[in-house]
Each structure stands twice: as structure tokens, then as C-alpha cells.
Amino acid sequence: MWLPVYVPLLLVFGVSLSLPQGSLGTDSSSLRGVDADTEKRINVGKKHLQTLRNLETRCHDSLQALVVIDAGSSSTRTNVFLAKTRSCPNKGRSIDPDSIQLIGAGKRFAGLRVVLEEWLDTYAGKDWESRPVDARLLFQYVPQMHEGAKKLMQLLEEDTVAILDSQLNEKQKVQVKALGIPVMLCSTAGVRDFHEWYRDALFVLLRHLINNPSPAHGYKFFTNPFWTRPITGAEEGLFAFITLNHLSRRLGEDPARCMIDEYGVKQCRNDLAGVVEVGGASAQIVFPLQEGTVLPSSVRAVNLQRERLLPERYPSADVVSVSFMQLGMASSAGLFLKELCSNDEFLQGGICSNPCLFKGFQQSCSAGEVEVRPDGSASVNEDVRKNRLKPLATYCSVNNPEISFKVTNEMQCRENSIDPTKPLAERMKIENCSIIKGTGNFDKCVSQVESILVAPKLPLPANIEAASSGFESVDQVFRFASSTAPMIVTGGGMLAAINTLKDHRLLRSDFSGDVEELAEAAREFCSSEVIIRTDGPVIQLPNARGEQKLNSLNFDLCKTMALTVSLLRHMAAGENQPSFIKWEKSIAGPDGKPLADLGWQVGVILHHVLFTEEWGRNAYEAGYSHNL
């Protein structure tokens, strides 16, 4: 490019060729001899240029979708969130954490454990759980594992697209498609104890499939090894903890929580709440510690900033986070039956008397899933995969290196009446037991839940992670550490137990965790008898308190009530007690509508997006285009 010879001369003499930024040209006072219409058009042009100049320097907001796929113990399910992003010149793009909202939850599809077990059934052969398998030989069948993963991902992708298409308007779709859609697929306790290389291989395949979506719908899904992976029990609990405190506005950069100390250092207090989350296969307990708390040397606290769960700009907090396998609703039910009905105190003449079941209820002696029929009889599913002892019995195998090479792990299995040397069917079987009958003795139910699940002599099997954090059982958690922070209990079964007692006016509507009040209410409820009506079986409550239909969801609700009583007693026995305890499914926003369900899903999003520079590199600099 060349310039006329007079241009340098103009520059030498300080003549500027650029227009002044404020006025964009000569001001109106110099426009002598110009008529009013011309001057008006000049001003319109100047204003138009100024508007465009402002657009170049201001921040721009747009919407982005985020997908969290919950690969839980019983199913795999998509959760689609929408968030506001802001892009500023020279600063990059970031997500407003307060804007994150759930716009749709998808259908439930097969769990990852089912995908792996079906693949092993086919290529390792039936009864692979009962004999040695050379895992190295199975590498030749990775392409077939890929096909199984592809079938699942196609269902999840179609379901996600259906949610996006139905929940977004056309303008929002344009923005969402342009930015790309980060996907976080995390497995929890369902495959946490799966041994060999199979689980990690499945995740390599899942990430590849997410990064290569169908081009037909126009949505650009993408992920990476940080976002799509198995998460530990402690992580699951910490993400649930972050979710709770974010949604309830306890977590934030609020200046009112901060002060400058005598040394000129900024100190921020936290007003965080703890959470007890009970899922299908595991339970998580997480709570913040008071400043100055002294823990035994064997107990490991987690600092949210040091462990990079939250950025430094958030108030610092040390928390206890522990996860127990075999304490979820399904897994604990299987283990509890196995132990209870192997005890001579409760097993007489082939009949197991279960104090946690209603009087008049009976079923065959198995840990299989139960269906309560209209005639009041209970049908037990004989499918091996529907047996609630299956995951534990698979883990407790002499063919699992965690058992064969670690004597303490084998002892834990044997302590729970599972012989690792026996075939899978025998490991799941309850010896010498044919029928289980309910007795409705709640106090005895509590004592058995306490001794089998909450305070066992040896750690429950597959709890290496919990033991490594310093806790071998739930009772030890509140003995070694405690907190005055509020505690929120969540999980479908735990909520159902409390809400059922409230519905029958056995608990006050504002019940806040008084353990003796709960024990008295549950004692009355669980002494009910099963009565067969023309429209099906009901629980006849004493003292004319009414009836409750008996079904597959509430027939063993008293065990959950007993677990809750035991948990509350241990909380109350700690050095510090929670300021209050609540049972919640979700947190409502200012409009009274739920922002999102409690659980780990929102927490895992926040864990990534709050580190704005790292998120910017992964989600925007690399983003979907990284996979092109």
C-alpha cells in the first residue's frame, strides 16, 4: 500500500487523519451554510457510526446449553441446562453461575453397568462372575464394546436433541448451536467398584462418540477427559455440596462476608450447609468444619480452594466429604436382607422374621426386586441383574484382584455372609431361608440397621475410598468430626420416609430433625398391619390414623426410617450438632419455582465454569472445533 507524498508531511506537523472518537467529525457549529435537513442527516450518520463503534467495545451476552449425563447405578439420564454467557473484548467468554437453570430431564436408559455386563456375558461367557477371566484376551472385543456404547449414546443424543428442540425458541437455538454444547457424562457408584480395564475403556469410547455427534440436527456436542469420566464418591458428595450451597445462595463472592484482618489480609467467612445424599448404590455425607476444628490425624479434610473445587475468590472452607458404598437405597436393601436372614436370631425353620417389614407382609427369601401385586402377594424378580445383591456379590469374588490380593477386603465380604470362593448364584443366595415375614418391630429394626449398616464391626465391602479418608463406618464420621452447620438430607427414599409420616400427621409439617419425635412416629407407623382390600393391599395405621396403599415403593420404608433415626442419633451425639436439619428435593427460586434438583449435577458444572480461564480454553478456544 502507498501513501501520497504529502501524508508524512501532515503527520510531521501534527495533523491527525483520524476522527475524534467522541464527535466522529467536525462539530455542528462549523457547519455554516448547511440547511437543517442536511445537518439532521449528518447527525444521524454520526450517531450510527458511534453506535457501531460502541458495539465493538461492549460485552455481548448469549445463551449456551450444557448437558450433564447422570450415569447412575440404576440408569443413565440426560439433564439439559441453559446458562447466560458474556463475551468481553480482551477478556474472553464466561458463564454467569447464577443464570444456570435446568430446562429438561430426559428419559431413563440402561446404566453403564448393564452395558458392561452384557458385553462381558457375550465375550467373556456366561457366569464370568464365577470363574477366572483373562481380561487381556478381551481387548480383541473392544469394537463390540464400541457398538454397545454407540447404541446407548444414540438414545441419549436423540433424547437431548428432543429436549433442546422443545425448550428453545429459534433465536436461542441459533446461539446454542453457534457456541457448541459442552457435555459432562459422569458415572457414580454404579460402576465405581467395577474391576479390570473395562470401565475406563468404556469412557474412552463414550468420549469419542460424544465428540462425533450426528450432523443432521446441527447441535455441536463436545467433551474431554476432564468432563466425561467416573467420579469418586468424595467428588460426588462435594459436587452435591456445591449444588446445595449455590442454589440456596450460601455460596458466593458476597463482600458482606469478607473483612480485612489486622494484618491487612482479606478474610471471608462461610455460611455453608452440609448435605446427606442417599442414592441407589451409595450415600454421601459432606459438611463444613468450624474454624479451629481439630481432627484426628487419620481424618482428611478437604479445602475447597486447595483442591481446586472453587476458585480463590470464594470464601475458604474446609469440609469433610465421605461416601459409603452399600448404603444406597438398593444396595443397602440387599446387604441388609443377606445379613439379617443369615442370623439365627431372625431365621427359624426357614422363615426369616424381618422387623423392618409390616406385619402381614411376606415374600420369598431373596434380594431380588419386589413387586407388590393387587392381591397383596409379593413377587420377587428372579433376574440376576435385578437382584440388589448383584453388584456386591460381583465385587466379592476371588477372581477380583481387590479380593484375592487383599485379605482385609475378603474378610469384609465374609463378615457379610458372602464367600468369595463360591459361584455368583451362591454368593447372592440367603442360605436355609425360604420365606421372609414382617414383624413390624421398629426398635429392633433400628438396632439391626445400626449393627449391619451404620456401625458394623468391619467396614462394609468396597469401601476402600471411605476408609482412606479416615472413616470406616457412618458412626465414625460424627464421632471424629462434627459441625454446627445446617444439614440438608436429600434422596428419593429419605424424602419419601419423612413425607409419608407427615402425610399421616405423625410428624409435624415443620419437623426439623428431633430424633425422638421421628422414632415415636416411625414406631407407630411401622406397627401397622397389611390388610387386603378389594382395590389392593393397604397398611392399616393404628389409632384410626387411616390407611396407606401398599406398593413396591413403600413396602420396606421402615428400613429407611430406621436408617434416618440411626443417622440423626449419631449427629446428635457429636461434639457439635447441626443448627437445624431439613429434608429437601430441590431449592426454589424467588418465584417459588424449583431452580434444580439437589444432587451433584449443578455442582459439576460450577466446578468447571467458575475457573473462567480454564473453562474458556476448554469450552471456547478449543471447544467443538478441536474435534474437526
From Swiss-Prot:
Annotated Gene3D superfamilies: 3.30.420.530, 3.30.420.540
GO MF annotation terms: nucleoside diphosphate phosphatase activity; ribonucleoside triphosphate phosphatase activity
Sugar attachment sites: 432
CC per GO annotation: membrane; symbiont-containing vacuole
Localization: Secreted; Parasitophorous vacuole
Entry keywords, A to Z: Glycoprotein, Hydrolase, Secreted, Signal
Pfam families named in the record: GDA1_CD39
PROSITE patterns per UniProt: GDA1_CD39_NTPASE (PS01238)
Catalysed conversion reaction: a ribonucleoside 5'-triphosphate + H2O = a ribonucleoside 5'-diphosphate + phosphate + H(+)
Protein name listed in UniProt: Nucleoside-triphosphatase 1
Species in which this protein is naturally found: Toxoplasma gondii
Lineage of the species this protein comes from: Eukaryota, Sar, Alveolata, Apicomplexa, Conoidasida
